[in-house]
UniProtKB/Swiss-Prot annotation:
Organism placement in taxonomy: Eukaryota, Fungi, Dikarya, Ascomycota, Saccharomycotina
Function: Plasma membrane signaling mucin that promotes activation of the MAPK for the filamentous growth pathway. Partially redundant with the SHO1 osmosensing branch for the activation of STE11.
Listed name of the protein: Signaling mucin MSB2
Principal location: membrane
Gene: MSB2
A cellular-component GO term for this protein: cell surface
Positions of post-translational Phosphoserine modification: S1300
Additional free-text comment from the UniProt record: Present with 1320 molecules/cell in log phase SD medium.
Residue ranges of the region described as 7 X 17 AA tandem repeats: 698-816
Amino acid sequence: MQFPFACLLSTLVISGSLARASPFDFIFGNGTQQAQSQSESQGQVSFTNEASQDSSTTSLVTAYSQGVHSHQSATIVSATISSLPSTWYDASSTSQTSVSYASQESDYAVNQNSWSASTNQLPSTSTTSYYAPTFSTSADFAASSVNAASDVSTASVPIDTSANSIPFTTTSNIETTTSAPLTSDTPLISTSTMSAADNVFSSANPISASLTTTDSSESFDQTSTAGAIPVQSSADFSSSSEILVQSSADFSSPSSPTTTDISLSAAPLQTSESSSFTTASAALPVSSTDVDGSSASPVVSMSAAGQIASSSSTDNPTMSETFSLTSTEVDGSDVSSTVSALLSAPFLQTSTSNSFSIVSPSVSFVPSQSSSDVASSSTANVVSSSFSDIPPQTSTSGSVVSVAQSASALAFQSSTEVYGASASSTMSSLLSTTSLQSTTLDSSSLASSSASSSDLTDYGVSSTASIPLLSASEQASTSSSFSVVSPSVSFVPSQSSSDVASTSAPSVVSSSFSYTSLQAGGSSMTNPSSSTIVYSSSTGSSEESAASTASATLSGSSSTYMAGNLQSQPPSTSSLLSESQATSTSAVLASSSVSTTSPYTTAGGASTEASSLISSTSAETSQVSYSQSTTALQTSSFASSSTTEGSETSSQGFSTSSVLVQMPSSISSEFSPSQTTTQMNSASSSSQYTISSTGILSQVSDTSVSYTTSSSSVSQVSDTPVSYTTSSSSVSQVSDTPVSYTTSSSSVSQVSDTPVSYTTSSSSVSQVSDTPVSYTTSSSSVSQVSDTSVPSTSSRSSVSQVSDTPVPSTSSRSSVSQTSSSLQPTTTSSQRFTISTHGALSESSSVSQQASEITSSINATASEYHSIQTTAATQSTTLSFTDANSSSASAPLEVATSTPTPSSKASSLLLTPSTSSLSQVATNTNVQTSLTTESTTVLEPSTTNSSSTFSLVTSSDNNWWIPTELITQAPEAASTASSTVGGTQTMTLPHAIAAATQVPEPEGYTLITIGFKKALNYEFVVSEPKSSAQIFGYLPEALNTPFKNVFTNITVLQIVPLQDDSLNYLVSVAEVYFPTAEIEELSNLITNSSSAFYTDGMGTAKSMAAMVDSSIPLTGLLHDSNSNSGGSSDGSSSSNSNSGSSGSGSNSNSGVSSSSGNSYQDAGTLEYSSKSNSNVSTSSKSKKKIIGLVIGVVVGGCLYILFMIFAFKYIIRRRIQSQEIIKNPEISSISSSEFGGEKNYNNEKRMSVQESITQSMRIQNWMDDSYYGHGLTNNDSTPTRHNTSSSIPKISRPIASQNSLGWNEV
């Protein structure tokens, strides 16, 4: 009973120690906390944070100054700070903000609110409150003559202004003037705003702000803008000094960019969007196209796999030095963005283009999932929705001349209000898993909501797209058309949007689904049936074999077409077939003229005329080789005509078409380390085609194929979603691995077994993947691993996240986040972020910060002057971002930041007559944020040079509560505790430290042993529960790192002690399930101190790898001992393991000691060691002996009881006989047999004697006999009288009936 009691006691002790850091403290609420601070100055700000028991936190900021915003329940200002070198320029910036909000109680259920802009309007006091923001910013910069070599260090922090966590309309008018001429020696400062809904850590959004309150109204100072030429933010991914432009914006010209770079570990994806801006450096783009004097350059560039490429675009002959990935740009009036993706193993590229006309220089750029009010001319708006199971993509843009607000038949989340000449409207609705509807309306004349419709008006084209989602198949229809009214013409590809001149607008609907088929139909009709009748304008008949080839040159690139096996049903059809072997040099296209005429095709037929004049000159060769095989395309139709470049064919009558596809397809690229080859199976389908281009470039995959050409559509229904778009149209591919390609500035959509959704064109990106995901943003490298969907968060946009771990969120009406450089020279700053975000309509986030060594804080002064000071922390800092008003569960994201700062000082001048403090504590999170007011402080200005690298790791397990800093024993304590370890010391230690949950043995895995060094000895690990938790949590990650994290079932079974005679401490040995095929490779990596096992890891995993003792074998402790113990059958071979008192310590059975030279002994329960195995065998024998002994004792006890019973009976009989001997010694001397015979004889003799005596004598004898008993013995006729004292006389009976005394005979 002592051992179970000791186990129970140790369990209670360990539980008590772990209770200090129990994960339940982060899950359940701890009551209500309130923090309120008020200044006694003229302007007051109060902050209240309430956390209820249902894991919901509400933050309330009430601010008023001079009675302007008196006691309004809304966030007034959320500002961030960044330090810029004061020697570069002198800047002064002012901004004024007024907010008001209008909503009703019923609106909260359906997320429908009415918003409008106003100026200095107070909120209503009725039940229907009113809220609307208005921003006005002006900045003046004066460049100095000093040109510092360091970059401008600006923190990227979103500015959120929200009320009740509901999005609202934001109107921004930004004007920037430069007082100094721009020369090559003048330093350039750029203005960037948060316009993407992708990443809150994007360095493309530097915003430097300070909060100031005057006597009349509140003002919001924004001080991070300068110059007409944007400064390219530094992104040093390989410890070099090269600068890659990720995102920049120049608001002096009518354009704005959005950049999102996403890199996946298993299937990396990069998505970028860029717009036009002016530069002063002299360089040529990789590829450009000049349209009618202006420049509209689609630039395509590829880099090696695994590298992060940047994107930029220019609009004048003097190009930027930045090497752009993919961009399209039109000078003077259009802004376009192009997205390209580069993957390491499976390729995926997605591109889209947006362009719109600019009438006045004042242009506002609105991010996704928000609405925009344009006061002058035009804007583009993109709305994207992400779903848990069916993530669609929807993007539209364009502009029309319209005065009235665009109306929509459906209730969408985004709307546009027009004040001036033109604007564009994009409508998108959040969907369930059953339906998707998208409508784009460009003018007051609206199209009906049907499957597909288009309407050409005086101001442009309005199109409506509706997509019904079926259970097994789906067809979507979309149309893109435009009218040209000015010499400036932009080429509009399919599945991308563009606006030419000032009177047209297209629509784009692109969706990617995990398991639901998606088909793209033409503008004329959609049919959800499994086959579609083909209507075309060309006739003819041809049957080609695989040997026939045809070559042609298209647009400056060489292409080779090879015919595949073709079978046609009609006697006379025309065949469009090709197998292209194209090698592109990415040459600079000097000029390009594209004219398109479309009478808006109908079901009967269509005619399209396309001409292309492209002259190419050699430039830097980018050698991209595509080997594609296309199907033979045979069509027939009613009597119609189709005119293409150089040919015309007409036919009469109606006929059908059949397509037989059976040919291989392969894709290769020099920039990819691998080559993908796809073998095509035979497939037959009938489709609807309207062909209007000179050639078709398609690719055949494992499934049925449909094609779409310019201003036409191809629809096909099959069991697997596959859609191909060529000739300035979209291309998509579905295969077992996500692979897709982009041609001629067109979009690419992908459908794979893994639900992945990518949305570009100023829209948010949502991803759901079962594979590790790595996100990379500008000026930072972000790596993410998640089993769930983890999007990023940006300003004024929605973020959606689904996680297996519910993490409570914090609702805040104001959020401030800032991380600046350290104030200490030559200091490495290391920070760790933990991010948890969720909520489709959340507009603000709360910030908490915790420092491990040096406290980091954000100091804000809320007083009459409302100045802000920030200080930075060095070493290790932890930030926790929690999304506002999140109702769903969210997964924690951990971000590790390491910032080397050679020299850094902060420049801040604060004049604060009165101070106040604001403190916020976010419940259910492991960090906190504090805003502390300080008095007037003057710091010396100096330059700041810093670069950060972010690593984002998402995990849905329960290891988030484990400390990230490795816990080890101090060297002094280890030396003190490492005295001689004996049997008496190990008796108090547990035999093993098992995993928290049951660990099954995976298939193909083997149990190995990983030993640790003295700093993690067994006694220390037992005494420090968090240290053992770190071994269970981070050792599998350390073992999986050199294998690129491809194994998912590496788990630690238990931690056991191992005693080595050559060591003075107990070695902690972790028993780990590891893939059998990689054990030898792991052993080689562990024995090599410079291998990837010790160098590739990051954070705690790398520290854990450094603690592994390479002298401990991986397999010897388990398998050799099993064989040795199994071979020893006699008791002598294993007796040494059982004898605890022998003290010899012989290890004759241990195969480890004989092979490695170290005599390992088991101090606990390393049950797979040699000693333990012999103990097991001996223990089994001992158990048998104990069982036999117990049975013998029980049987012996039973026999003893029976013996005692018989002995007791015998003793009782003996005592009775003894008493009889004492009473009758004469009788007792005679044997019972003799006594019986003699008695019978005497009785007979007496009877004979009595017969001869008289009657009176007989009476006397009878009386003697009756009184004294039968006393006549030994032939005595006289009675022998017994002792009267011991005898009992008998009562006489009647002698005779005649006389009771018998005297009649006497």
